[in-house]
Amino acid sequence: MFIAFEGIDGSGKSTQLNLLSQYLKSKGKKVLNIREPGGTILGEKIREILLDNNLNINKRSELLLFLASRAQLVEEVIKPHLKRGFFVLADRFSDSSIAYQGGARNIGVETVSTLNDFATDNIYPDIVFYIDIPTKIAMERLKDKNLDRLEKEGQIFLEKVRNTYLKLSKLRDNFFIIDGTKSIDNVFAEIKSIVEKHLQS
């Protein structure tokens, strides 16, 4: 099973991914945690470029770098592990590009979706958890952090990202909005319940 965690910066998605990973392992499942961009030697080098505060990256270049990292991750890591029966848990996947570059960068949701399909060889998560928080809360959570290039974009940018994610939720049955303002335990309880239902179906 392939599960992706999405959300604006500061949403707590990485925490929830780790909790689900620990839970599945406790049930005897084989689990692989991955992150985007990254997860491969090439992907980690691309990650360094994308998050470098000293670089001025054109929005189309930014998108193509994300797609290159994703394409490598799918072929080198995701496909082989799914074939071996692993639960693959992704800290961001294709919907991040749709929200950040397609929506917030105004490249266009349809354009990015088409390019995503090519980059991923039409691989899409079985479940997407979007951890939703207001942008004001996100900015509060990020204020004491050493911010990377994308995290420095500010609240207006994050608002565009969030709005695009919320639109995506209306288009897909396997895209679940989780209220990230609840306690960590309550958020995880909701995620665990959804995963267990999918495992039983």
From Swiss-Prot:
User: Which residues form each disulfide bond in the chain?
Assistant: none
Tell me yes or no: is Calcium among this UniProt entry's keywords: no
Q: Name one Pfam family in it.
A: Thymidylate_kin
Question: InterPro entries attached here?
Answer: P-loop_NTPase, Thymidylate_kin-like_dom, Thymidylate_kinase
> Secretion signal: which residues?
none
Q: Which family does it belong to?
A: Belongs to the thymidylate kinase family.
Primary role: Phosphorylation of dTMP to form dTDP in both de novo and salvage pathways of dTTP synthesis.
Q: What's this protein's name? A: Thymidylate kinase
The protein's organism comes out as Thermosipho africanus (strain TCF52B)
This chain is encoded by the gene named tmk
